[in-house]
Regions:
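Short, well-ordered alpha-helical segments enriched in acidic and aromatic residues
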Residues: 110-111
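Ser/Thr/Pro/Gly-rich low-complexity linker/stalk segments immediately outside membranes or between
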Residues: 47-51
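Bacterial N-terminal signal peptides
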Residues: 27-46
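Short alpha-helical segments used as structural interaction elements across diverse proteins
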Residues: 22, 43, 295-296
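N-terminal secretory signal peptides that target proteins for export/translocation
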Residues: 1-25
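Terminal "cap-and-tail" regions of soluble proteins that handle hydrophobic small molecules
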Residues: 52-101, 105-107, 117-375
Length: 375
């Protein structure tokens, strides 16, 4: 059920409204819709916007992100700021943030698409953009972390520390673990099954996403994603076609000025590295101000922790002349294991939430540095 707030802005059913400064006052996906709608409507007349850009930015981030006056000043000064988005779903974490970037919109969106550079350095072990169409060689650099190889050796449906669907378990059962090259066979299994998974998704979309059976309770990636992103129907005209395309891929019509690609990454999360496969959609609005570019990153698979995830990255202009700077807005949503129960809700989730917020601030700052360094 979707309800409205006092100003008529729809509220996503899985999120609650915050009452304290510094915490977001609107839900995740609807928040971005409101942000971009305000940017498009309020900032449209360039002469008017040029005179009141700071005021518009204050409304943008203050009213809908709940930024305090000091946070607003920090964003305008080029400091990244991130806040926690309240959620009524116990196994969901959502954070949002923004930073002003002194670069053109074109340069910033090019950085956002350069995933191999964007996801590199500390914490990132390997990132690879896939060919179009994807091929087995794209996964040549993939190797299971040593801990995962040991875990896979003993994995069974319903009892495995690596997230796998039934087809993967069927292939895993064919490995001769007594062979001296068993680890390489496990890596070959990972490469081939990853390629098959991406190709199946490209053919059948969400219906071909995994149903994880590594624990006693099967987890449907497609169902979790549909539930988490259920508010995307409320996005404004600019984003609605993108939301439909992401949910209905590959049969849904792809909006104009839209491209997509896939990539995999191996990065450190918590106690162990996580192998992930993502679908990226990039859209240029063709507008002179407001939402200029939107990048959506949909997680298709994660070897640990994450059931599903969605990242939204928006390049928002406030009417300044080209090259004088734009805002980068980022929203990260994820549904994860281990966040429920007494231990999960009281200890693990608060720590993970703080880590997600702090991580987003670092990511915003890193993207800003990359974009400004390329001027």
């Amino acid at each position: 059920m979707v309800v409205g707030n006092s100003k008529g802005v729809p509220v996503l059913r899985s999120l609650t409204r915050a009452r304290t400064p510094g915490v977001v006052r609107a839900p995740v996906l609807t928040t971005l819709a409101a942000v971009l709608a305000i940017a498009a409507a309020v900032l449209a007349p360039r002469a008017f916007v040029a005179a009141q850009s700071h005021e518009s930015a204050a409304k943008l981030f203050g009213q809908f992100f709940g930024f305090t006056a000091s946070q607003l000043a920090a964003v305008d000064a080029g400091t990244s700021v991130a806040v926690v988005l309240p959620s009524s779903v116990d196994h969901e974490i959502a954070v949002a943030g923004a930073v002003f970037v002194q670069a053109t919109a074109a340069r910033l969106v090019s950085v956002l698409q350069d995933v191999e550079r964007l996801e590199s350095g500390k914490g990132f072990l390997r990132t690879k953009r896939l060919s179009n169409p994807p091929r087995l060689g794209d996964f040549a650099g993939f190797q299971w972390p040593a801990g995962d190889v040991e875990a896979l050796r003993d994995c069974r449906p319903g009892r495995c520390s690596v997230k796998l669907g039934q087809p993967a378990f069927d292939l895993l059962a064919k490995i001769d673990w007594s062979a001296p090259d068993a680890a390489e066979h496990a890596n070959a299994f990972g490469r081939q099954s990853s390629l098959d998974y991406v190709l199946a998704y490209r053919k059948g979309g969400n219906r071909n996403l995994a149903i994880y059976v590594d624990s006693e309770r099967p987890q449907s990636v497609a169902r979790e994603f549909e539930e988490m992103s259920g508010g995307v129907d409320l996005w404004p005209v600019v984003l609605t076609p993108l939301a439909k395309y992401l949910r209905g891929y590959p049969t849904a019509a792809r909006p104009r000025q839209t491209s997509d690609f896939f990539y995999w990454s191996l990065a450190e999360f918590g106690l162990r590295p996580v192998f992930r496969i993502n679908h990226v959609v990039v859209h240029g609005t063709g507008r002179a101000s407001g939402p200029l570019h939107v990048v959506l990153v949909k997680q298709l698979y994660a070897s640990h922790y994450f059931r599903t995830a969605l990242e939204v990255r928006a390049v928002v202009g406030d009417g300044r002349p080209s090259g004088k700077g734009v805002y980068l807005v980022m929203l990260n949503m994820a549904r994860s294991d281990g966040l429920t129960g007494v231990l999960g809700s009281l200890i693990i989730k608060p720590k993970a939430t703080r880590g997600s917020r702090d991580g987003l601030e670092r990511a915003l700052a890193a993207v800003k540095r990359m974009a400004e360094a390329r001027r």
